Amino acid sequence: MAATYIRCAAERHFARESMGTLMQATLPDCREALLSRYAGTVQCVYLDPPFYTGKCFDMKARIGEKGYRTGSPALTLLAYDDRWESRESYLSLMRETLLLARELMKKEGTIFLHVDCRMHAHLRLLMDEIFGESGFLNEIIWSYQSGGRAKTYFPRKHDVILFYAKSRSYYFSLKSVPVARRETRSNHMKRGTDEDGRTYRSIMSGGREYRYYDDEPSYPDDVWDDVSHLQQRDPQRTGYDTQKPIRLLDRIIRCSTQEGDLVCDLFGGSGTTAVTAAQLGRRFLSVDKNPLSIAVTGKRLQQILGGAGCFDVEAPCGADDCEVEAEVYPAISSYTVRLLGFSSPAAREAGIDGLDAVDQWSAGFVQGETYRSCVSSARTADSPALKTTLEMPVCAGEPCIMLVDVWGSRRYYLPQRRY
């Protein structure tokens, strides 16, 4: 029943035209590949880089069915390291990232750079240098409520999103992001009702009456205080530190892109950019050096898109140091694939038993050096148990399985054939 380890150069989930790509790599390592494939094609770039905090940020990885049901057992794993030798080393990375982003963008493209008070001033000057002062569009204030108090200064409860265009022919649609009209406080405007029964407020200026109807759509300005920070028990939570809410990315992507456009995130993290883009019918490119980012994002995409969506994964294969038991039963028009056992040095060291170390897996076929996933199972809060039997149709290629462990490492195996 022992499965045979193999290496695959690429991975495609489901057999349709791809909606996007998840790429595990450092930006210096993948720069040339990105430019050769995507230069001049990206409509919107969103970057949520490290904030120069001097800290490490974690991901809480739940273990097995019990971990997903109760929150324990779980591992605390490194999401990203935000410690730097110097401010210059940080700004050097950001310069190279922004230069790369500019090359990837279309002439009509825009970029949103998410920062906080630590590097805001430095990055604003860097954005002016790379995109030109004329490329500046907005300094968006994202104001939110979160825990924590300060006694020696006012509490810091906002981030800044720097919004720039690559050229003056950029695309932007404010009408695509209407917001609920708020109850306005009493002011000097006069209340009225027109002949159709519509209520409004009016003001006279320069001998002319200006009416503001209560049922007219309202649009956000450059202070966004209507998008909540993710709370600890928010269903969106993946366990990834500094995760951003879908509502925030929804507004950014809607106003700056149209259906079918390509959205890029070079600090992919928990995958909110890719997930939101897919939900809105946009294509996506998400890059991160941490295998956990690719694992979390891929799982979120499968949850949201199911069999209706297709995406590619480009990530290094995990080491050939695991013991996997899997078997496949061929039939006339389908295959039954069973995952029976898993063991790895990391799992044994962490005291994790068997399949509890597997967070997600899929069954599909190897065609050349590409693994094509047909059906999958992943642990989630709503579905903590991992399916150990999957049914898939007969397709061209060798039956194969892909496993992602709790550390985010992905490996490919040929299951033992049973007749």
Locate each region found by the language model:
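Conserved proline-anchored active-site loop of SAM-dependent methyltransferases
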Residues: G40-M59, M127, V263-A277, S286-V287, ...
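Glycine-rich helix-loop-beta junction characteristic of Rossmann-like nucleotide cofactor-binding loops
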Residues: S36-A39, E103-L104, I252-Q258
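Short glycine/proline-rich turn/loop motifs
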Residues: A74-W84, V227-T238
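Short, surface-exposed basic-aromatic patches at helix termini and helix-loop junctions that form
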Residues: Y38-A39, L125-E133, T276-R282, Q303
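Phosphate/ATP-binding catalytic cores across multiple sugar-kinase/actin-like superfamilies
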Residues: T97, Q243-D265
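Accessory, often C-terminal, charged low-complexity segments
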Residues: M1-H13, M19, Q43, R124, ...
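Conserved Class I SAM-dependent methyltransferase catalytic core
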Residues: A79, W84-W142, A396-E398, M402-L414
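DnaQ-like (DEDDh/DEDDy) 3′-5′ exonuclease domain used for proofreading
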Residues: M1-L100, R118
